[in-house]
Structures are given as structure tokens and as C-alpha cells.
Amino acid sequence: MKDLLNLFNQQRQTLDFDAIKIGLASPALIRSWSFGEVKKPETINYRTFKPERDGLFCAAIFGPIKDYECLCGKYKRMKHRGVVCEKCGTEVTLAKVRRERMGSIELASPVAHIWFLKSLPSRIGLMLDMTLRDIERVLYFEAYVVTEPGLTPLERRQLLTEEQYLQARQEHADDFDATMGAEAVYELLRMIDLQSEMARLREEIVVTGSETKLKRLTKRIKLIEAFIESGNRPEWMILTVLPVLPPDLRPLVPLDGGRFATSDLNDLYRRVINRNNRLCRLLELSAPDIIVRNEKRMLQESVDALLDNGRRGRAITGTNKRPLKSLADMIKGKQGRFRQNLLGKRVDYSARSVIIVGPNLRLHQCGLPKKMALELFKPFVFAKLQRRGLATTIKAAKKLVEREEAEVWDILEEVISEHPVVLNRAPTLHRQGIQAFEPVLIEGKAIQLHPLVCTAFNADFDGDQMAVHVPLSLEAQLEARALMMSTNNILSPANGEPIIVPSQDVVLGLYYMSRALENKKGEGMVFANTSELKRAYDNSVVELHAKVKVRITEIETDDRGLRSKASLIVDTTVGRALLSEILPEGLPFVLVNTEMTKKNISRLINSSYRMLGLKDTVVFADKLMYTGYAYATRAGVSICIDDMLIPIEKKEILGEAEQEVLEIQEQYQSGLVTAGERYNKVVDIWSRTNERIAKAMMDTIGTEKVVNTDGEIVDQKSMNSLYIMADSGARGSPQQIRQLAAMRGLMVRPDGSIIETPIKANFREGLSVQEYFNSTHGARKGLADTALKTANSGYLTRRLVDVTQDLCVVQLDCGTAGGLTMTPIVEGGDVVEPLKDRVLGRVVAEDVFLPGNDDEPIVTRSTLLDEQWVAKLEEAGVQSVKVRSPITCESPFGVCALCYGRDLARGHLVNMGEAVGVIAAQSIGEPGTQLTMRTFHIGGTALSAAAVDNITVKTSGSVKFTNLKYVEHVNGTLVAVSRSGEISVLDTHGRERERYKLPYGATINVKDMAEVKSGQILANWDPHNHPIVSEVAGFVRFIDFVDGVTVIEKTDDLTGLSSREIADLKRRGSQGKDLRPLVRIVDKKGNDLTIPGTDLSAQYLLPPRSIVNLQDGAPVGIGDVVAKIPQEASKTRDITGGLPRVADLFEARRPKDPAILAERSGVISFGKDTKGKQRLIIKDADGSEHEELIPKYRQIIVFEGEHVTKGETIVDGEPSPQDILRLLGIEPLAAYLVKEIQDVYRLQGVKINDKHIEVITRQMLRKVEIVDQGNSKFLNGEQVERQRVIDENAKLIARNELPAKYNPVLLGITKASLATESFISAASFQETTRVLTEAAVRGTRDNLRGLKENVIVGRLIPAGTGQRYHSQRRYSSVGLTQSEMETLVGRSTSSGTEVTSPSKDAIPLGG
């Protein structure tokens, strides 16, 4: 018996391994795999259905068809195990060996492996230093190649045509060898001596001068080095023996009706065997050369088709005209082995059904239909029935269950109690799409889902379906309960805000009960406590919305954590007081003593979680939901057409707008405005009008006049059903109500431009035919967009997951001093994101001091900033904090807990092993479908605002200038002459309240540090023109002004004033080519003046289309406008918005016309122009010059004599992220990416924490480029994983040798995923063939560090609970005990860093 058990065990064992290596298979290796040679193309005998001997399904080679039974039936049963039948040659063993035993085909002539030939760059070509075309001509028998020149003048690897070959044979007889076909290539590859070739190339690379040659040599050196290191031989890229896949992996299945379904591979193998056998015969018969050659070529083609059909020439098709699936097709693409069977598998013990709402469930429960539960938990029920003695065998138990006896249901109840199930809704865009619940048995066939988790699943009840899975093992159940339970997923991992938030009906009910109305029954009554009030309400003494006074008892917690009771009488309403009854102890009544809109409810749940913890919050959320439903039912809110009130002012406002449009039309016809300006102005007018009508409508709907208790008529918020729904955040938005009751507004054409005639009607009035067609235009575009968006968004998520999948938290502290400096984000003067939101949950990198006081730090280094710390920082008026960031983390693989900071979904420091990469990818990808696909024209979008032309202060305080260069005008105002200047407004504590960018040429009405009042105008400028300002006083001198050539004189009809416009380059003709019109400022005697602080003369180059209003010789003062450039033209640039913009940023694509940044700091001057380019020179402090040639059509935004700093924009445009990295470094790049990506999401109202974007940026910066190889083995210009260079340099420094120098490189997410160290992960992402070819040549070893690789090889992932398993495996193989291991892994904090946090629950370190 013992032997029998051992026998079963030895077949179950799996290999334990730490890495996977891939390489080229030598012919000897292929033969060692083989269990016999396949000699015939036959598959099975059509009469007996038994495999043919020596055929593709031969039992003698591949093993028996039935377990322990030979083919002829002589040996049966297990007792003959291992016997080889002498009659049919089959070994008696398990049939499943037919899945693992390989065969082989001995090829009559060598054949090139198509992957190493055609997968670019061609490895065979690189190895032989021949072009792919030449090698193909040799392989496919079109040319000879010299393999051994002997003493003849021919050269090795020289190609000869048929004629040249015959001529050479006549001249030199047998002194040389030249052949064609794969034999020739095989010979050439076999002759290569890798070591000496390597030495020769290394010598050559030093002396070579040409750039292209250098590239080619570097590639060859890398390739040959790879061959030497991996132990591969070049001639193995040519096949002399072909392996045959085990037959059960290319099955032949009988269908009913006597036909067979077969795998395409069998057809492909059959062709190879047929041609190979035919070739053998021809060679035996020594047939004419031309026939043999043709047969060899056909053999080569059939092997090509088997390995990768369609890679060369036309794909071989089967009977039904579709290309046959070759071995390469089996592994690549969505249906390939990687993505279909290894990364995504079907799961047993699962069910799916429609979902319905379960308003009486608790948060941790879901309703499971009885039938479904019985099917899912069948094995458990069988076992219990047997254990109870209700059934003797499994069969009997099965009968009981099928009859659905009464006791079965009782046992099912017991089985499912405390056994969580996992619910999943597709598409699973983030980890909240799979959560665990405790099942409750229900009648019917639909699954009941708790309403509060709908947001997380993005589920609604209009026919959505969900899948149920049963965690079977104890560990799985434990993880489902501890980590995946819906009650543990209250906060969203994307932004740390509650995701379990009531919506729709619940919000409506809570909002309805918390509204206060004037003059309701019982107003002014005073109650001793809430229960007294409840009695009064139940007896209809007071109404729900009446304003009353109630005594509330609260429990307060002081700083030391002591709790005390406090009573206070509050002004509130009946509804709010009733709501306070469900408040958990410890939450202040203030939180519900307000209108419970969706925002406030979210804030309430958030406060509850932070103050009271998880358990109380879950119970509270449930109570809120029940209450909300109850009062929504009582409210009985419904909408009807009378709720859509059209404002009386609408007619009047429309009349005014139409009048304005007419005026502009007249101006256009008399030529005062251009077509573009007219369009922009009309769109502007209608946008403004729409806003005005919408505001009037919201005022009409949202307020009503009522009589209060004193008999006065007052305004109060109305109880209009439509308004209630929008105001509470339950359903609908002002945008939608505006279309129902105000006006539909401007519509968008499919290309994103705006139709200038708006829809003046609303849906209540109804649209006219023309209006209806205008509106269908935009609506159809919307639907088409949605379909595209879903696919694009899914693909973005896939790329993001792929690039970050191997990033986990690996240690507590990497000990780095680096970090990013965080400041509030200000746009258009408003603080869009205050500092507190940006630093919350981050770890401080440097001590933070009070502004202007460097003695006592407020917050010390390595403190995790939680809500209390952030409040302290805000109180102190701190404006910038340096925090640790994943980008600057120095952990070798992964990130450390302190650089990452708080786990947003849990609210404490992140645990060891958390897969922060995948979380980041999901958080960014999940809202992808909410983003638009639009490109915006800055002409004004359907929601455009009018152009800004001044800065008006919103808060009182003092003014502070930063980076601002200005000159003082004669009249005392200041004129800005810098581009990056900013004005901030500080409050009394020195905290920045507003910040504005100042354009060049703006007039500033205040001095630095002056006091300002709110509403005061600080600065103004002309939004439609870009001025050129003189920095010195003197007289104007025109240079190169030639009438009719470089300038066009224009006289204004109305005013009679003349101005000169600089002519466009195209209009100048030949004599104006080299003229450069400029204005120079001179003194009385006509000598050039210089710009203060430089030795450059004060002259201003005038770009085309600029307008000069001065006359030659006119006096100018400091700060006067010399010329102005109309802004109209440069503004039509499209802004890519939405999803495409996010994808462009993550792919690190260069914009079309990128901004040109200053390569160094210095003073600007202009040199001689070339044909289509302008020459701009930057002269730095030590006098060296840098030249930049800029196309004439680009707008240079700097002037002669201006001082620029390195990395500043000198030519307008979108900056390229690569330039920012190169000139400014990693921190500004990170800031740029975070800002740009956040702008897109913020526009859609999506909140994502910065750290997710930083995590992805870290992965984009994984590689570095070697600038100077030093004594390392890297090559100049090579891109290497940063960690490899750091390790290599450490070794070099230890040996006192020169380390390699390198620069960081920014890779797009697709490139970064393919350039990962793991070839398994890269191959399963994209370009499978290329990745595997490259890896095989290099003999790459995959250390299985990431998540994907481990899923593919079928192990636990090295993240979360799997991380302990992996570290235990690693240490037990070295022979360490558990306790030794824990000291190594770092239960203690490493590098002596303490993590401090003032919250009452301490942070669990190390998980």
C-alpha cells in the first residue's frame, strides 16, 4: 500500500525553481528531448483510428493512448508499469506522457530559423555582417556565397550570381568553395571564432569615425558578447534537426459524422515531413541540381511556415482560406498562450446571475439564490451529509441533494455561515471590482447586492450581471475575510476618500430630512432631548423641517484621550435632530447640523473613519442608508413638467445677445474684424448669454418667496423636486437642468469645433427642426466617442499595469535624503489644490520650520503627515514642504514604505509587500472612461470663458513679486519685462492666498510688498496683442524698413492714423529676403543705446505681422510700447485634451512643434539668418556661445538682450518631457508630469493622489544611458537598468577603477514595459517574437521578481501575503530559521529612522 501511495505522490511533485533561463537549443539538445524520429506524415489509421507507426501520433514515440495499456493490448494494468511491448513498441505508462514527450525530424538539409533571420534586427545578418537581402538570396537559392576563398582574389561572404560563379570556376577551378542555401550560411556561422571577432571589433570601434559605422559595430559587439556570455553557438540559429510538439498539444479529435477536427500544426508538420522525405529520396537518386535546390527551398519555406506562418511571403492557408496557426501564433496576441491561458484562466466553483438591489442587507452581506448556493457548495454539503450520517456514500448524498430534501437546506445554511464568497463585476477596472461578502440565502434567481457598494463596482440594477466565486482553501477564506471583505474597503485607493458613500435615493432622503424651512408647524419649540422631539414628531406636533432648539449630549475627547460628556442646546431642525440619533458616540453633532448633500455625507463618513475607526463607520454607513431610504419614501419626490420653470428674463437676455451678434456682423462686413475674430466673439457672446440665462433659471427654480413667523416675506431655498435632486447631488446637474429649462446652448461639431448658432430653446419648449439637427450632430459624436473611449482607456490601463506590475514595497526605509518639494497648485489665481491636500499621507524628507524662524522645527524629518500634522502646518502658514517620493526612493527593487507614505485605502503607513505599482496603474486607468476624447480649440469651447485681461485681488493682504523683472514708466506704473514673473497675495500670517502669472508687457499698479484690498486691480494688459516694451529712453530708428517689401503702410478709415505692419516672409519677394526689420533705440546724436546691465545694443527684432504705431525718430520713454504682435494667429493651436493627452504624457511622446528651451543660462542675441531659419545665440557668463537654429514660422518669445536661465522657454510651444529631464533634472520633470496629468483629471472632477503618477514616473525613469563607460563592460550610448549600473559602479570603485558615467533616460510606458529585465513579462505584453528572439540569443535569465512572471509560471505572487512565502522559501534554501530570517527582513526599523505619528493608533511596522 505504501508503495502505491508513493507512486501517486511522485507524479504530483512540481519543480521548485528560482529563475528561468532561455537559450538556443543545440541539435544535440533537441535529440536528447526526442523519444524517437517521426518519419511518416500519417496521423491515424482511418479504419482502426489507431495512430500509425512512426507517424505524427505514433504511440511508440509519444506514449500510450490509454493509461497503462499498450497499443496492441498485450500488456494491460499497472503491474506491467514501465514494460516496452515487443509487438507494438509502446511503453506501458500513463497516457498523459503524450502531453510531454517530444519527437524530432532529422532534416535532410539545414534550414534557417525564421525568427533569427527575419525578426529585426536580423541576428544572422548581424553575426555575419551581411544584409538581410543578401542572406535571403543565399538561403532561397538565388545566389552563391563564398565560404572559403583559398588563395583566390575572392573574399569570404562575397555573393556571386550564377554567371559570376561559373566564370570564377573557370578561372580558379577548385581553389575556392562557394555554395548556396542554408548549408552555406551554416558553414559561415560555424567558422566564426567569437573571441577573436570580439577582439577585432573592439579595436575597430576605437578608430572608427563615422556615426553609422559606430552604431553597426556597437550592435555587433553587443550580439557577439551575448553569444559568448550565454554559451550559445551562432550555427545553432540554423536548424539541422526539428523538434516535434507532443501530440496531445496538437490534438486530432473525431467529430460526429466520421470527420476529424485537427490542430493546424499537424498540417504544417505534415508538409515539412513530406518535403523532407521527398528531398531524402532526391538526394539518394542524386537528382539534377535544380530539382534538389527547388525541393530544399520548399523545405525551408515549410519550416518557416511551421515556426511563424506569414512572417515571410504569403501565409499558407488551410482548406477554408484562412492562414494556418503556426507555433509563433500559439503564444502571441490576446488569444495566445500567455494572455489566454496563463494570465487569465477560467475558474471553477463560480456562478453568475443578474443583480438586484438588497436594501435590507448589512454592508458585509450579499443575497445568494438558494439554487446557486447549493450548486456552489455541493462538496461541502456532501461531506456534511455523510458526517451527520444522513447519507452513507457520496452517491447517496448526491441523490438527497438532487431531490432537495428539507435537511439539505439546513445543512446548506450551516455550510455557508461564515464562509465568505467573492463577487466580481466585469469590467474589473480596479481592485474594488472584486470584493468578498457573507452570503445570505434568498429565494429567486437573482443575486442581491448592497446599495452602498455599487459605486465601487460601478454597478446599477438595469440588468447588470455579476459573478460569484467560492474561496475553497482556508488561506483563501482568510484572505477574503481579512483583506477583501466589503467592510474593509471603505476608502478608495485612488484618493483616500470614502468610496462607500450613499448615492441617489439615500442622499435624497437624508437631504430632504435635513432641510430647514420657514414657518413650519412647531417652529421655535424647545426640546429636552431627541427622544422627546421624536415623540412630538410622531404625534404630528412638529413638522420634519421646522426650526427648533434641542439639547444634545455629546462625548468629547481631549488631547490626552480622556472622554467627557457635554450637553449643549443647539439651533437645528427636527429632521437633523432625528438624524443625530444614529450618530455614533464621539462624532460631533455639527457634522449633521447642516444640509446633507452628497458632499457633506461623504465628509461625515470620512470624519467617522478618521475619528472612530473602521467598525463604527461600517455600522454607521448602514444606519445612514436605512434612514435615507425611509425618509426618501416619506418625501415622495417626483418631477413633472411644471417643475421646469423657464425664467421670465430669458426673452430679454436673448434679445440683447442677438443685438450684439448683429453689431459684430456689421463690423465684419465693414472689414473691422477678421472672420476668425468674428467667430470667436460670437461664440463668446453666446457662451456668456447661456451662463446668464442658466443663472436666472437656477435662481427661479432654486428660490421661492414665503412668509416667516414675523409675517415678513423672505426668500428661501425652494423645495422644487428638480432643484432638490440637483442640489443634494442625488441625480442630475445644473448643466442638465439648464438644458431642460434655460437654453440648450452651443453645440459641438464632430471635429470638436463649435457651431456658432446656438440652440436657443430648451427641452421644455421643444426644439425647431434646424435646432434638432444641430443637436443630433453633437450627440452622435458623443456616442461614437464612448465606444472608442472604452477601448482606448482599457489599453491605457493595460500598459500602465504592465509597466508597474513588479513594483512592491520591499523595505521600511531606504535611507535617502531626497524628495520632492510640494507647494500649493495655483491656477488663474485660485488655489486649486492647497498644500494640505498634497502632503497628507506623505513622509517629511527635511525638517519643516516656521516661515522666517529656523530654530525650532514644526515637523521633524521622517514624520508621516496625518490630518493633525497637516492642520498644524496650515496653521503655521507653511508654503512648501519637502516630502519623500517614490521617484527619489533608492530601494534597489521596488520602493520603501517611507518614500511611499500612507496606504490610501487603509489610512496608515503602507504595509510591506503592498503591490503599489498595480494600485497606481488601476487608480489612473479606472477613471479613463470618464475622460473625453476631445481636442480643444482655444477658439472657445462650449464652456469657454471670456479672455482675461487683468488681475483682481480676491482677498486683502500684501503683494509679493517673484521672479519679476520690471521697468518703471514715466507715469509711475511698473511694466513687466519678464515672462516667468508672478504676483502673490499674502495674508497677515504671510501665507500665500493667491498667485498669478504676469504676462510680458503688463502694467502693474502696485509696488512690491504693498498692502491691497480685496477687489483692487493689481495689473492689466491687452489680451489680444503681445507688446514689445522699450527698456531704455531715447529715439526710435527704423532699420530695414522698406515700404512695400518688408513693411506695409496701413491707414485706419475711422481715425485716419497710419501704422506699419511687418510683411509676411512669403510676401517679401527676392529683394526682401535678407532684410531684418528692427527698431533700434538711439540717443540724440544717433549713437546706439545699450540695454542696462549688458553690452548689447537696445534693438528689437520685429516678427512678421507685428504692428508699429511710432514714426521714425519719435521719442520713446522707458516702458513705452515700441510695437505689438496681434495674438489672434497663434491662438488657434489645438490643445489635446482628455484621454489622448494622458496617453501622450505617459508614452513620453514629443509634441509636434515642441517648445525650444534654453540649453544654458545667458544673454540672448540674434545672428545671421539662414534660408528658412533664424539664428539665436545664448552667451553665458564665461563668454562661450551656444547657437540655436529656429524655423522662421516659430514664434520666438524672447528679445535681444534678455537674460534667460537654463531650461527656460525661448520658443513658444508645448515643452517636451525629454528636454525638461535633460536640462532641468528629475524633480522638475516629475512636477511637470504630475501637473499636466492632474490637469486633465481635475477638469473631469476626478481626484487621484499625486503619488500614483509618481510611481509610474519612477518606472519610466528605470533606465539610464551610459555617457562614459569608464572601466565598465557597458558601451557608450547603451541603455541599461539603473540598478545594474549602480551595482557595477560599486564593484569598480571597490577595485579603484573608473566607474561608468550616465544620464537618466525617460522611456514611454510601452517602451519601458518591453525594456524590463524580465523577458517573460515583456513577451506576454507585446511584440512576443522580438522579445523572445532577443532573450534567447542573450541567454537571458528571468529572476521572477515581478507579479506577472510568477503568475505565468504558476506560483504565488511576491506581493502581499505571498511576499512572506517567497522570503521564507529563499531563506530556507540557504538554511536560515524563521527568527534569523525575521531579523534580516527587518522586523525592526532599518537605518535608525523612527516613524512618528500623533494619531492614537500606532502604525504597525513591517506589515
From Swiss-Prot:
What cofactors does this protein use?
A: Mg(2+); Zn(2+)
Catalysis: reaction(s): RNA(n) + a ribonucleoside 5'-triphosphate = RNA(n+1) + diphosphate
According to its UniProt record, what is one Pfam family this protein matches? RNA_pol_Rpb1_1
Can you list the GO cellular component terms from the UniProt entry? DNA-directed RNA polymerase complex
Record organism: Xylella fastidiosa (strain 9a5c)
Q: Function of this protein?
A: DNA-dependent RNA polymerase catalyzes the transcription of DNA into RNA using the four ribonucleoside triphosphates as substrates.
Positions of Mg(2+) binding: 460, 462, 464
Q: How is the cofactor bound?
A: Binds 1 Mg(2+) ion per subunit.
Q: Which PANTHER family match?
A: DNA-DIRECTED RNA POLYMERASE, DNA-DIRECTED RNA POLYMERASE SUBUNIT BETA
- Binding-site positions, Zn(2+) 2: 814, 889, 896, 899
- Assembly notes: The RNAP catalytic core consists of 2 alpha, 1 beta, 1 beta' and 1 omega subunit. When a sigma factor is associated with the core the holoenzyme is formed, which can initiate transcription.
Which family does the UniProt entry place this protein in?
Belongs to the RNA polymerase beta' chain family.
What is this protein's record name?
A: DNA-directed RNA polymerase subunit beta'
Q: Keywords in UniProt for this one?
A: DNA-directed RNA polymerase, Magnesium, Metal-binding, Nucleotidyltransferase, Transcription, Transferase, Zinc
Give the E.C. number(s).
2.7.7.6
